[in-house]
A protein has these predicted regions:
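C-terminal regulatory/oligomerization modules of transcriptional regulators
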Residues: 96-152
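Short, hydrophobic-biased segments on the C-terminal half of alpha helices
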Residues: 14, 46-47
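Key DNA-contact positions within bacterial/archaeal DNA-binding proteins
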Residues: 40
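A short alpha-helical element within helix-turn-helix/winged-helix DNA-binding domains
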Residues: 26-35
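Beta-hairpin "wing" of winged helix-turn-helix
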Residues: 53-67
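Alpha-helical residues within the helix-turn-helix
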Residues: 33, 50-51
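Conserved segment of winged-helix/HTH DNA-binding domains
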Residues: 71-95, 110, 114-115
Length: 152
């Protein structure tokens, strides 16, 4: 499955917001520069995501965009369909030399593929696409050396 550039930017921006970890709004300019995306184009995408209830915006000096729900509650399908519209089989099969029953079987098969893809994309949440948090090394307790010993 190939994602459009617009969907790719939408996913990238929502993941940046999810990775931010706070509910503080992030300016579009920061998302654009950190994600290496064109700011004006990204702004249009963010507005669409806001319209679909995926993001919320805050105006003002400290304004920007944030996720409207937790990353565990936003599916990849929601982001894709907010930008590209409903995932579909691609329309009717072109008229061909094939008998009508073959065309019907093909449409049924394509519909099943689309339904499976929709279910898979719905099951993938933004939280699952985030990189794991960095491991913080745990050091063993310090072992006293002769230098540390105090004579009594």
């Amino acid at each position: 499955m190939k994602l459009s550039r617009t969907v790719s930017y939408a996913v990238r921006a929502t993941l940046q917001l999810a990775q931010n970890g706070s509910s503080a709004p992030v300016p579009c300019s920061k998302l654009a520069s950190e994600g290496e995306m064109p700011e004006r184009f990204l702004l249009q995408i963010l507005r669409v995501l806001e319209t679909h209830g995926i993001l919320k915006s805050t105006r003002g000096v400290e304004g920007g965009y944030s996720l409207s729900r937790s990353p565990e509650d936003i599916s990849l399908l929601e982001v894709i369909e907010a930008i590209d519209g409903p995932l579909e089989t691609g329309g009717e099969a072109p008229p061909a030399e094939q008998p009508a029953d073959v065309q019907q079987l093909l449409q049924t098969a394509l519909r099943q593929v689309t339904d499976t893809a929709r279910k898979q994309l719905e099951s993938i949440k933004l939280s699952q696409l985030l990189p794991p948090p960095p491991l913080t090394p745990t050091l063993p307790p310090a072992v006293p050396t002769e230098k540390d010993a105090v004579e009594i």
